[in-house]
């Protein structure tokens, strides 16, 4: 079984921004739809068993290669807006019995443009698709994540000393890790 277990922010670290599967989930996302889309990391757990012991010389084929995510949207409140299903790229290799992260644009720019200057809550229903190492197509569980679209949202970044500049890991229009780089 392939399970999307949480949505996490990138964290600023020396040398750039990183994702860590032990990061706590931000239970409610926020972004400014006038500034573009909304991106975070999905933590995926591969609960499939290592199948290399089924026959002599067999190799494990249950590692999961992420290819894309299909995202459906359910509007919770606000003015009626059509939010069409989106297919967005993803990439990661999740080893058997392990966890991994794929960065996904949960609300792509076309959906953000449809929301426009409206304030609303949107439920994103994300399912990740890919292949096992034997080529079979598989998909993860569906994960629901609620995001507040707020055209007045402004990310509060750090105060940096020159020559450093403020860095917003996943974009300055959304909740994300920040630092000086």
Report each predicted region and the residues it spans.
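Non-catalytic macromolecular-recognition regions in eukaryotic signaling proteins
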Residues: 1-181
């Amino acid at each position: 079984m392939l399970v999307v277990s949480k949505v996490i922010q990138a964290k600023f670290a020396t040398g750039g921004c990183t994702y860590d599967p032990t990061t706590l989930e931000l239970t409610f996302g926020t972004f400014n739809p006038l500034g573009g889309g909304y991106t975070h990391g999905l933590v995926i757990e591969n609960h499939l068993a290592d199948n290399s012991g089924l026959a002599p010389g067999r190799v494990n084929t249950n590692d999961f290669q992420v290819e894309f995510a299909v995202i459906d949207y359910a509007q919770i409140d606000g003015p009626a807006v059509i939010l069409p299903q989106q297919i967005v790229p993803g990439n990661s290799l999740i080893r058997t019995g392990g966890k991994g992260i794929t960065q996904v644009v949960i609300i792509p720019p076309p959906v953000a443009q449809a929301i426009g200057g409206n304030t609303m809550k949107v439920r994103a229903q994300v399912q990740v698709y890919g292949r096992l190492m034997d080529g079979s197509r598989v998909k993860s569980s569906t994960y629901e994540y609620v995001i507040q679209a707020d055209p007045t949202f402004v990310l509060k970044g750090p105060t940096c000393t020159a020559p450093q500049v403020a860095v917003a890991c996943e974009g300055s229009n959304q909740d994300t890790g920040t630092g000086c780089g």
